[in-house]
């Protein structure tokens, strides 16, 4: 099972939010590229980056910072937040990004996502509030169930689905294993769990499930409630 440490960017700083609320941002670093180096030293293979400003604005706002992070590390990097067209994917690809996360586009423009999946390594980001898909930086909640959206991409050639339970995100309240399993079952696609990881017990629960490909760890690391080195050992 892969563990993907997370860097969420707001105005060039590494921050964490609670339940996706921008006014809850807590700054953890003004040099996010140094965090990337630290994660590599701890044993990470992947890094999960979200341009929070981009997610709300629908365009890349932290592109220069992301470029600097990519140049500072040999980690494979996936990026999401504000990717709505192929030009942005090309820009990030040329910067050295490995995988591109399409969230709002996955709900609003599935044909675009399917086309991009034929050309690039695409992860579909499915973020849910009470089981329903939320978009535009989680500011809008649709009437589409997360599992129904996952099914749409079953044979589309996307590389992974990243599923987030928004009610858990940034709360250190424990990961929603059942939700992640349902997404994996609905889609048959490698599923990465996100939101709520609090300690090593969450890593163990996801690993024991046997159905989850990966997990994103953010606030638990920044707040010191998880030993990442130990987490990588458990996930192996």
UniProtKB/Swiss-Prot annotation:
Q: Where is the active site?
A: 8 (proton acceptor), 127 (proton donor)
User: Which UniProt key words apply to this protein?
Assistant: Amino-acid biosynthesis, Cytoplasm, Histidine biosynthesis, Isomerase
Provide the GO biological process annotations.
L-histidine biosynthetic process; L-tryptophan biosynthetic process
Principal place where this protein is found?
cytoplasm
The GO cellular component terms are:
cytoplasm
Q: Name one GO molecular function term.
A: 1-(5-phosphoribosyl)-5-[(5-phosphoribosylamino)methylideneamino]imidazole-4-carboxamide isomerase activity
EC nos: 5.3.1.16
- Lineage, top-rank taxon, reads Bacteria
Q: Which reaction does it catalyse?
A: 1-(5-phospho-beta-D-ribosyl)-5-[(5-phospho-beta-D-ribosylamino)methylideneamino]imidazole-4-carboxamide = 5-[(5-phospho-1-deoxy-D-ribulos-1-ylimino)methylamino]-1-(5-phospho-beta-D-ribosyl)imidazole-4-carboxamide
Classification via Pfam families: His_biosynth (PF00977)
Q: Where in the cell is it found?
A: Cytoplasm
Q: In which pathway does it act?
A: Amino-acid biosynthesis; L-histidine biosynthesis; L-histidine from 5-phospho-alpha-D-ribose 1-diphosphate: step 4/9
This protein's record includes keyword Cytoplasm: yes
Q: Which family does it belong to?
A: Belongs to the HisA/HisF family.
What is the name of this protein?
1-(5-phosphoribosyl)-5-[(5-phosphoribosylamino)methylideneamino] imidazole-4-carboxamide isomerase
Q: Which organism is it from?
A: Campylobacter hominis (strain ATCC BAA-381 / DSM 21671 / CCUG 45161 / LMG 19568 / NCTC 13146 / CH001A)
């Amino acid at each position: 099972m892969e563990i993907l440490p997370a860097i969420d960017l707001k105005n060039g700083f590494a921050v964490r939010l609670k339940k996706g609320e921008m006014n809850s941002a807590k700054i953890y670093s003004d040099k996010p590229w140094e965090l990337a180096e630290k994660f590599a030293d701890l044993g990470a293979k992947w890094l999960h980056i979200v341009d929070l400003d981009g997610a709300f604005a629908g365009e890349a706002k932290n592109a220069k910072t992301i470029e600097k992070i990519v140049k500072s590390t040999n980690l494979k990097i996936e990026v999401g937040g504000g990717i709505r067209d192929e030009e942005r994917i090309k820009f990030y690809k040329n910067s050295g990004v490995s995988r591109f996360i399409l969230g709002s586009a996955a709900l609003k423009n599935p044909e675009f996502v399917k086309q991009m999946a034929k050309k690039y390594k695409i992860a579909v980001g499915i973020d849910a509030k009470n089981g329903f898909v939320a978009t535009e930086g989680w500011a809008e909640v649709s009437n589409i169930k997360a599992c129904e959206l996952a099914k749409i991409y079953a044979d589309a050639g996307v590389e992974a689905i990243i599923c987030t339970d928004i009610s858990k995100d940034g709360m250190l309240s424990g990961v929603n294993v059942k939700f992640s399993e349902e997404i994996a079952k609905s889609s048959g696609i490698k599923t990465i769990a996100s939101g709520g990881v609090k300690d090593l017990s969450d890593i163990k629960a996801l690993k024991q499930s046997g159905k989850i490909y990966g997990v994103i760890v953010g606030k638990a690391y920044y707040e010191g409630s998880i030993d990442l080195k130990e987490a990588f050992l458990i996930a192996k």
